[in-house]
Amino acid sequence: MPVITLPDGSQRHYDHAVSPMDVALDIGPGLAKACIAGRVNGELVDACDLIENDAQLAIITAKDEEGLEIIRHSCAHLLGHAIKQLWPHTKMAIGPVIDNGFYYDVDLDRTLTQEDVEALEKRMHELAEKNYDVIKKKVSWHEARETFVKRGESYKVSILDENIAHDDQPGLYFHEEYVDMCRGPHVPNMRFCHHFKLMKTAGAYWRGDSNNKMLQRIYGTAWADKKALNAYLQRLEEAAKRDHRKIGKQLDLYHMQEEAPGMVFWHNDGWTIFRELEVFVRTKLKEYQYQEVKGPFMMDRVLWEKTGHWENYKDAMFTTSSENREYCIKPMNCPGHVQIFNQGLKSYRDLPLRMAEFGSCHRNEPSGSLHGLMRVRGFTQDDAHIFCTEEQIRDEVNGCIRLVYDMYSTFGFEKIVVKLSTRPEKRIGSDEMWDRAEADLAVALEENNIPFEYQLGEGAFYGPKIEFTLYDCLDRAWQCGTVQLDFSLPSRLSASYVGEDNERKVPVMIHRAILGSMERFIGILTEEFAGFFPTWLAPVQVVIMNITDSQSEYVNELTQKLSNAGIRVKADLRNEKIGFKIREHTLRRVPYMLVCGDKEVESGKVAVRTRRGKDLGSMDVNEVIEKLQQEIRSRSLKQLEE
């Protein structure tokens, strides 16, 4: 009979099989009331599942991350319950958990309107407030199939036929008259599912295949309590204000249009930000001793067949042909960098060789996934590739890590989560090689005092990798940086160097990305700063304004003086009230506004205001220039007097 060991090391002995709920009741009524599920020997199970042998048990509550995921998953079933009551002929497809919520794909003979979604949410609340028990039943594959055939649930039948073994026992979850199929676990009672909101609808092909029927996807969010739900909705509201697409239009940074889906038309001010970001990256490349190269954006398909990209990636590649040859527009820079490395004999003395490129890449992303600057088809990668010996891996990874943190800190990103992905089951190379490579990555992180977590088995078949995920001011995660070891591509493309023993050897290749893509990172920065770019990045850093025409000559002189000092400056000599001009340039997020009246002309000074509405008073022009140059040169995140 089972001995149950709890997280604090205490044990409970039973003379019969028990469920997590039984153990929770044994500990106390408060824990039983909070019990959502259990973790038995590391595996999540329903609160009602029986434990027949000795086991480690943790009771899962709404305070646990797993508990919140279970609540969200059960809310997806609640959505199914409600939609079948409102529109009984709906066919249910899949309803998984996603970040911050859930969705359900449904086949419905009507297009859902906003009023429909509101009615659906209302019915969900009515059902949840009944606090009914969710009943789990394990059945045979045949019984599950018969259940869904009788109910006309063709998508569930398809899942059983194509994804579930005939000797398996699927879990059926009964919500009163509604039944759904799932691995679980789910909440034992709907009292846990009171704090949710339906967010939006979208189209989605069954199984993600455009040859299949288009379904309607209903998105929702769910939380453990009302406070958490409201906080999330407030974050969404703030995120909407910061939407880079909205700000990009307000500030005239760029636009997209139907004739070039997923391609960016950079306007002058947006391109200024792009170029300043390039200058910053180039400064760091020089500091960390990288070469900068430029490869062709299109190469013969034969090369992509050699690399393996054609076999595994061809659906995402744009192609064209000329003179009976097929060409691929590059989706990434690495094969081109190997071609550059292969020019001329290389010695171990030439390594490490660090090769960077602002590579113009294209990927045939599905049109439905395109999203402003965040998901595009044409983008500029800031990646680099380091060719080195196995002995140099640790030092080179160390340098990559320092560069990542050096660059992220410039933009004020402090919360960075790091994950180390290790060898998958299918891989190339010996265990000894993987042992050393994984150890090199781990030691490099440890030497930099960087906490990290392992993602076991999540590495690529050709090498382990480190992923850097930064969190913005709204605590949203953006996976940008990677350091990926590659033991395959150099060999596939016949890269070699002459070692100390005068024998030819294959170099290790380190793929290194920091920003990810210039376009996406500018989108991230636009939302992080809400368009209030630090002065060094701002397209226009200073606007000088006159009050009347009598100061026009003085304004023009100052404009030229600041421009000669390397400051991006504009003069506003329009015959408008000064308050109107200030408001307009404040809305344009111009960091500094210099106002010139008769008093300033006489004294040779300027009245300085910031875009945040702070009046810095009258200042000497040379002093203003000197302080602005220092702020720009240091790439400060703060303005004067902040």
Swiss-Prot record:
Residues 1-61 form the TGS domain. Zn(2+) binds at residues 334, 385, 511. The keyword Hydrolase does not apply. Its main location: cytoplasm. Its cofactor is Zn(2+). Pfam families: HGTP_anticodon, TGS, tRNA-synt_2b, tRNA_SAD. GO terms for molecular function: ATP binding; metal ion binding; threonine-tRNA ligase activity; tRNA binding. GO terms for biological process: threonyl-tRNA aminoacylation. It comes from the Bacteria. Residues 243-534 are annotated as: Catalytic. Transmembrane segments: none annotated. One of its GO terms (cellular component) is cytosol. Keywords: Acetylation, Aminoacyl-tRNA synthetase, ATP-binding, Cytoplasm, Ligase, Metal-binding, Nucleotide-binding, Protein biosynthesis, RNA-binding, tRNA-binding, Zinc. InterPro entries: aa-tRNA-synt_IIb, aa-tRNA-synth_II, aa-tRNA-synth_II/BPL/LPL, Anticodon-bd, Anticodon-bd_dom_sf, Beta-grasp_dom_sf, TGS, TGS-like. Binds 1 zinc ion per subunit. Its EC number is 6.1.1.3. It is found in: Cytoplasm. The modification N6-acetyllysine is found at residue 286. It is an enzyme of class 6 (ligase). It catalyses: tRNA(Thr) + L-threonine + ATP = L-threonyl-tRNA(Thr) + AMP + diphosphate + H(+). Homodimer. Belongs to the class-II aminoacyl-tRNA synthetase family. PANTHER family: THREONINE--TRNA LIGASE, CHLOROPLASTIC_MITOCHONDRIAL 2, THREONINE-TRNA LIGASE. Catalyzes the attachment of threonine to tRNA(Thr) in a two-step reaction: L-threonine is first activated by ATP to form Thr-AMP and then transferred to the acceptor end of tRNA(Thr). Also edits incorrectly charged L-seryl-tRNA(Thr). This is Threonine--tRNA ligase. It comes from Escherichia fergusonii (strain ATCC 35469 / DSM 13698 / CCUG 18766 / IAM 14443 / JCM 21226 / LMG 7866 / NBRC 102419 / NCTC 12128 / CDC 0568-73). The lineage of its organism: Bacteria, Pseudomonadati, Pseudomonadota, Gammaproteobacteria, Enterobacterales.
